Amino acid sequence: MSTEVAKKQEGILQNKSVCIIPARGGSKRIPRKNIKLFHGKPLIAYSIEVALKSNLFDKVIVSTDDEEIAKVAIEYGAIVPFLRPKELSDDFTGTGAVVNHTLEYLKNSGEEFDYCCTIYATAPLLNEKYLIEGFEKLKNSGAKNAFSCTSMPFPIQRTFKITTEQRCEMFWPENFMKRSQDLEEAYQDA
């Protein structure tokens, strides 16, 4: 019995789900980053492979504006049903708009999904067990969404900025004398 069939029988996959991997071609900081080689494979290949290996998704889709990225994505098993329009491919377009565009495209093509997962093309260390664990937590919690996070390596309550006068100014001066272990733990999205 295949892993996918076994998971469906266990109740993990009772609804339709899609994975959307946004991958713009015009990165300014690291040009062509989504297809740069990382340990012998294009960076985006790792995200596609982990999505496929998890067996959580009915479709793994790459939303891109770039023909070369599209070609690489298809080579590694993703679906690229369109090239993203220019107005959704600039430096100011957020992930939400890209995901919504893809979901609208799918809906207009007669496909609707109960669950949508976004994996960034720049996540080569993501492990499928965390995708499965996150999906199970989402389904069992009744929440509308879930995301990965990590604890901050230091207390954010002790952070400061450098003023225009080149002086340190704490964001929360009331915490200056507190011990770091007495401050509440904070998290950031990962």
Task: Enumerate the language-model features and the residues they cover.
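Short, high-confidence coil segments that cap the C-terminus of an alpha-helix
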Residues: 57, 111-113, 142-143
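Short phosphate-binding loop-to-helix
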Residues: 61, 67-117, 125-126, 133
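Conserved core of the sugar-phosphate nucleotidyltransferase
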Residues: 97, 101, 123-190
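Residue-level signal for alpha-helix termini/capping positions
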Residues: 52, 107-108, 139
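N-terminal glycine-rich phosphate-binding loop and ensuing alpha1 helix
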Residues: 13-63
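Short amphipathic alpha-helices and their capping/turn segments at secondary-structure boundaries
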Residues: 2-16
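Structural beta-sheet core signal
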Residues: 19, 62, 118, 145-148
